[in-house]
Structures are given as C-alpha cells and as structure tokens.
Amino acid sequence: MDTTLSHTPGSRLSQYLALTKPRVTQLAVFCAVIGMFLATPGMVPWKVLLGGTIGIGLLAGSAFAINCLVEQKIDAMMRRTAWRPSARGEITTLQILAFSTVLGGLGAWTLYTFTNPLTIWLTIATFVGYAVIYTLLLKPMTPQNIVIGGASGAMPPALGWAAVTGAVPGDAWILVLIIFVWTPPHFWVLALYRRKDYENAGLPMLPVTHGEQFTRLHILLYTVILFAVTMMPFISGMSGAVYLTSAVLLGALFLAYAWKIYRDYSDALARRAFRYSIVYLSLLFAALLVDHYARPVIGM
C-alpha cells in the first residue's frame, strides 16, 4: 500500500508551488513593489499595487515553471535541485506546461486589467528573456550566462515603476543596473561551492570552465563595481542620507565577504556569502523605500 503523501491535495499543491521557485519569486516581486513606491511621491493606488504585484508574481512563477520543465533532467543530476517535483518525475511535462500557461495567462490578464500596456509588454519580454533566452540558450552554452541573462532577472523594479507611471525613466534603470551587477557575484559564490553539481550536469558555469581562482577574482571585481553602482541613487538625487548610509554599510560587508573569498576561500564561507547576498539586496531595496518616505520628513 502506498503511504506517501504525493497524491494528497496538500502535497500536490506544494509540488506545483515548488515549480514557481517561491523564494526567488518573492524577491523579484519585492523589488517590483519597491519600484512602484519609488515611482510616486505619494502612495501607490491600491488597484495598481495589488494588480501589479499579483500580475508580475504570476508571470514570474510561470517563467520559473518553464525553467523547471526545461531543466528537469539537469536538476535530477544536481543535489541542490534533485528534490524538485519536476526532477523527480512527480509532475508530467503536460501538467507543467498547463500550469505555466494558466499562470502566465492570469498574470497577463491581471496586468492588462489593472496596469498599462507598457507593463504587460515589459513583463512578457522579461518572461521570454528568462524562460527562453537564458534557460534554453545562454545557460547551457556560455559561462557568461549569468552576466548576459541577468538582464531579465534585473527587470522587476522597472516593471513596478512602469505599472505606476506608464514609463521607465532613468531612476528606474539605475535600480535595474543594481540588480544586474549584483547577479553575477550572487550566483558565482553559489557555483563555487556547488561546482561539482554543475560539472556533473554539464553546465558551463564560470568555476567549471575557468577555475576557482578566476571565479573568486571576478566575484571580487563585480562586488567592487556593485558598491560603486549602489552610490548612483544618491548621486542622481533619487535617494538621500538614509539610503547612502545603508548602502555603504551593506556594501562594505559584501566587499568583506568577497575579499575573504578571494584570499581565503572555503565552501562554508561561500555559503554564508550566498545567503548574505540575498539579505543584502532585500535590505538595500528596503533602505530605498524607507529613504523615499523619510527624506521629506528629515530633510536629508
């Protein structure tokens, strides 16, 4: 008698939810919401906030489901991803396609109903950039997959900004640039301590193709560039002292991790740096939000 939970409604729901990579989706949606609030000096209209958040989240989940479908054989060979229901064969190809289509359709309809055409097209372009260009073309072909493909993953703040204003001005692109430059060191520290996984799966990640030392150097270089780029919101006048102080402190710790990885690497250190990189981006964007509403009050 089969006593597993794989056929219960709750476990089936959790399997489908896992396809959307909830933690990654949450971070993407969080950055999009910050983009919405930074786009206006007041409050975001609740219909735009709700519709934009749900629509962007659904389309992001749809793209991640396609990623799981395309990479199910690769995921099955990697310890980090072998647990995914797609890799374990617990959900069929047709079911994943149907699930992704429903999510994508609902997301596009929600954005059409509550936002504007620019937001829809930008979000769909982001979907194609991640699910097709990155997943199918870049990731299995070049060690620069993260650098080039990071453009689609960096778009959420621009999507949020467009949802509110119907435009994507320079300040929104600064936010995109921050995530774009953050992406390589974030993923490369993961690739360092998961190098064997990527090697076994045949993926040309930087540590596999160019070695550990080369990757460690580039993590440091990109983290230095990231520190400089995070000064741009203050330099452009978009943010004030609250953000600047936060960016300097958060960036200094990220630089310390990158320097330590370069000089005295260990897998345990890389794991801590990877976890911190997620906290770093979340707190950096939270600081942008706090500064946005605190600045008129404190005058800094």
UniProtKB/Swiss-Prot annotation:
<keyword id="KW-1003">Cell membrane</keyword>
<dbReference type="GO" id="GO:0048034">
    <property type="term" value="P:heme O biosynthetic process"/>
</dbReference>
<keyword id="KW-0812">Transmembrane</keyword>
<comment type="similarity">
    <text>Belongs to the UbiA prenyltransferase family. Protoheme IX farnesyltransferase subfamily.</text>
</comment>
<feature type="transmembrane region" description="Helical">
    <location>
        <begin position="94"/>
        <end position="114"/>
    </location>
</feature>
<dbReference type="InterPro" id="IPR006369">
    <property type="entry name" value="Protohaem_IX_farnesylTrfase"/>
</dbReference>
<feature type="transmembrane region" description="Helical">
    <location>
        <begin position="146"/>
        <end position="166"/>
    </location>
</feature>
<comment type="pathway">
    <text>Porphyrin-containing compound metabolism; heme O biosynthesis; heme O from protoheme: step 1/1.</text>
</comment>
<protein>
    <recommendedName>
        <fullName>Protoheme IX farnesyltransferase</fullName>
        <ecNumber>2.5.1.141</ecNumber>
    </recommendedName>
</protein>
<feature type="transmembrane region" description="Helical">
    <location>
        <begin position="48"/>
        <end position="68"/>
    </location>
</feature>
<keyword id="KW-0997">Cell inner membrane</keyword>
<dbReference type="InterPro" id="IPR044878">
    <property type="entry name" value="UbiA_sf"/>
</dbReference>
<feature type="transmembrane region" description="Helical">
    <location>
        <begin position="217"/>
        <end position="237"/>
    </location>
</feature>
<feature type="transmembrane region" description="Helical">
    <location>
        <begin position="172"/>
        <end position="192"/>
    </location>
</feature>
<feature type="transmembrane region" description="Helical">
    <location>
        <begin position="239"/>
        <end position="259"/>
    </location>
</feature>
<dbReference type="GO" id="GO:0008495">
    <property type="term" value="F:protoheme IX farnesyltransferase activity"/>
</dbReference>
<dbReference type="InterPro" id="IPR030470">
    <property type="entry name" value="UbiA_prenylTrfase_CS"/>
</dbReference>
<comment type="function">
    <text>Converts heme B (protoheme IX) to heme O by substitution of the vinyl group on carbon 2 of heme B porphyrin ring with a hydroxyethyl farnesyl side group.</text>
</comment>
<keyword id="KW-0350">Heme biosynthesis</keyword>
<feature type="transmembrane region" description="Helical">
    <location>
        <begin position="118"/>
        <end position="138"/>
    </location>
</feature>
<feature type="transmembrane region" description="Helical">
    <location>
        <begin position="278"/>
        <end position="298"/>
    </location>
</feature>
<dbReference type="InterPro" id="IPR000537">
    <property type="entry name" value="UbiA_prenyltransferase"/>
</dbReference>
<feature type="transmembrane region" description="Helical">
    <location>
        <begin position="24"/>
        <end position="44"/>
    </location>
</feature>
<keyword id="KW-1133">Transmembrane helix</keyword>
<keyword id="KW-0808">Transferase</keyword>
<keyword id="KW-0472">Membrane</keyword>
<dbReference type="GO" id="GO:0005886">
    <property type="term" value="C:plasma membrane"/>
</dbReference>
<dbReference type="Pfam" id="PF01040">
    <property type="entry name" value="UbiA"/>
</dbReference>
